[in-house]
Amino acid sequence: MNKQDVTIYDVAREAKVSMATVSRVVNGNNNVRKETRDRVMEVIKRLHYQPNAVAQGLASKRTTTVGLIVPDLTNLYFAELSKGIDDIAVLYKYNIIISSVENRLMKEDAVIQGLLNKQVDGVIYMSNKLSEEAAEAFKRTDTPVVLAGTVSDNLEFPSVNIDYKKADTEALNLLLNDGKKKLALIVGDKEASINRNYRIPAFEKFVADNELEGCEIFDNIKDYSDGYNLYPELAKKGINGAIITKDVSSVGLLNSALDRGAKVPEDFEIITASATQIASVVRPALTTIKQPLYDLGAVAMRMLTKLMNDESLEDKHIILPYELIKKQSTLNK
């Protein structure tokens, strides 16, 4: 059966349930027994059924709508990325539907499917990590997808990023030149593709190439309190220089160091890798790997407009320039 021809009736017949039951399953209604829900979902996947949220008569027409998936609407990193996306969307007369997957009880693939059900013309996915659920959901659709500020492990989806290995290596060289030899890489999630495939290998290579000892990677540092509570452990281990991937955590780390009498940058240096506005308003101001967040979003949206118009991409994986902004949290020798 051609997947374009599959209807809710076909799913109901195959699953031996009513069309109303299929509708309840599709819409996430909990008033369906697990056994029945599982059977309906199996048929939906097998038949590649994609329910329409608009009239069937509009099925072949464009909605001029783009779906934007973000993990956290309050995170400045994603807010600045979104600004670039929105400006280009307005320029090309696209509307944006934003879906957040933060603190969702439903699975991420259900959030993605909810967007696809609205017949968006394309999707931009922003997250620190492309989950297996998201990747599988994107593979099941013909809707164009672009990743902004993240990558897939096998580079199967178009993306816009910076050269994370090069950026982190330059930052580590700055710390080493300042005399800091016990270094830390502090990340939110080791399994995030950017960390696992780029940042962590760059850190490990730098430590090995320079024969440094006592260096360490710290995981699961995601908010202010995580950063604040981490510093005593760093101090105990003699860590005197750190790259941290989340700005809000870097502020916690900075304040904790200062509260415990450490001199920044003389005793302890910090470089943050996100470079949102937070990094510039704290004192001492934080040295940052400045990512062009607005441009990352704008370029991702421009790529998506091409894909939605069946145009080819000259480069599926665009690397934008970064800048190491030296401020008061490093000696900058």
Curated annotation (Swiss-Prot):
InterPro entries attached to this UniProt entry: HTH_LacI (IPR000843), LacI/GalR-like_sensor (IPR046335), Lambda_DNA-bd_dom_sf (IPR010982), Peripla_BP_I (IPR028082)
Manganese listed as a keyword: no
Coiled-coil annotated spans: none
Pfam families membership: LacI (PF00356), Peripla_BP_3 (PF13377)
Limits of the HTH lacI-type domain: 6-60
Highest taxon above the source species: Bacteria
DNA-binding region location: 8-27
Keywords, alphabetical: DNA-binding, Transcription, Transcription regulation
GO molecular function, one term: transcription cis-regulatory region binding
Manganese listed as a keyword: no
Purpose: Transcriptional regulator of the pepQ gene for prolidase.
This protein's name: HTH-type transcriptional regulator pepR1
Taxonomic source organism: Lactobacillus delbrueckii subsp. lactis
Gene this chain is encoded by: pepR1
